[in-house]
Amino acid sequence: MRKFPFVLCVIFLILGLLACGAQPAGPDMTTKEETAMLKAGYARVNITPDYGVPMSGYGNDAVRISSGLKSFLFATCVAFSDGEDTVLVIQTDLSQADINVVNEVRGWVKSKHNIPMENVMIAGTHSHSAPTVSGANASMEYRADLIGWLEEAAGEALADLKPVTGIYYGNQNCPNLNFVRHYTTEAGIIKGDGLNALVESPYTGHTHAADDLLQIARVDRQGGGSIVMANWQSHPHRSTSESDKELSSDIVGVMTQYVEQEMKDVLFIYFTGASGNINPHSRIEAENITKDYKEQGNALGKHAVSILRGEMSRVEGTNVQVCTSAYVAQINHEDDHRVEDAKKVVEFWQACYDTDQTRRVAYTYNMQSIYHAQRIIERSYMGVTQQIELSAFSVGDFGFAVAPYEMFDTQGVTIREESPFQATFVISCCNNAYGYIPSMEGFENDTYEAYSCRFKPGTGEALADEFMSMLGQLHTTK
């Protein structure tokens, strides 16, 4: 009888200890990074029209209707998902992205796959031998077809999501494959390719050396089918003359074919970098340059394969993050007198356009002056400011800055070199089409990209700073 209370005490003690063990152990401090299972998906869809369409170029008044085919055009999509957040980037063999097309596709992805609209990004390779999708000349039939094809690419990439076993990064300088298209002359004048190509004195050099760094990322996946991403800065090679009416994926298509044939089990996607002032050819180094888009694409492909077969650095991390910013930029308005002068120039040119006087007008004003006058008038009808949607995302320790405009190479270098991430791609011509936004050097050199820009000088540098802030924000929370 005397032992019973002791036995009860022991039992109650054991039950108490068990009860304590069953209590919550405090908050779960496991991070998203530690639990994420990164997956990547890929898809490629043919977006070549089988009918004649207006083609993109330099905004020429003459409309080129396609009548032939050099190579097929594609939309290529890569998707990344960590189980919580998903991002899709669709690269198209088109000049640029049209915001209305982008929003249609974003809306479809959101409704079908519950992915936020800002997590869907659509870019152009900036091909000048592709259908135009913006403005009055665009084919509405092609736009409708394109939207369906882009939705198809997004859906297929999401269906293709497979576990990532590793991401690897490498780069290589590619001399004589791109050039800054602004030149100094013996007369101390800055000239450029395009509308101000007439020169009063011989060229003496480039305003600065081009950013010739080719970046490559390889995303290995469970079961094979590695995704290879390339980031290179250059305008296309193909002509935009009135006689050139053949559709072409240009340098990108040739580079894609070369890499996939050489490396076999890889899936290639190309992103256009900061190339607003970069061409694939030079007026003063003709003996060193590639002669056409096929030679250019194969040369870049060889560099890419060299990187892939060499030693690449493993990129750590598995989480996916997206950041957006609505930057308010100032419109570069001219005074009333400049606007009136511009109207007189355009009126005179239009009166002589397509007549025997066209050549005389070109010599009177030169095409650069006419182009400049047109832009001055356009800006006079704009408001004081315009909002520019910037995007950035990260996959582990890999950052991506997504620009809806043609960025100059110096801004791209700044973002890449000052980014807190192990590696950073700059993707231009993505999500919208704000045209050129030059560096301060571009404005000071008085080139046609500066004439074309609707925003005030200094906007390019301010946007680069904004991208750095966005990448910093992503890096601190990765």
Tell where the protein language model's regions lie, with residue ranges.
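Bacterial lipoprotein signal-peptidase II cleavage site
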Residues: G21-P27
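Small-residue packing motifs within transmembrane alpha-helices
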Residues: F12-L15
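C-terminal motif of bacterial Sec signal peptides marking the signal peptidase cleavage site
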Residues: L17-A19
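Conserved beta-alpha junction segments in alpha/beta enzyme cores
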Residues: M29-A123, P131-L267, F271-I284, N288-N298, ...
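Bacterial N-terminal signal peptides that target proteins for export
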Residues: M1-L8
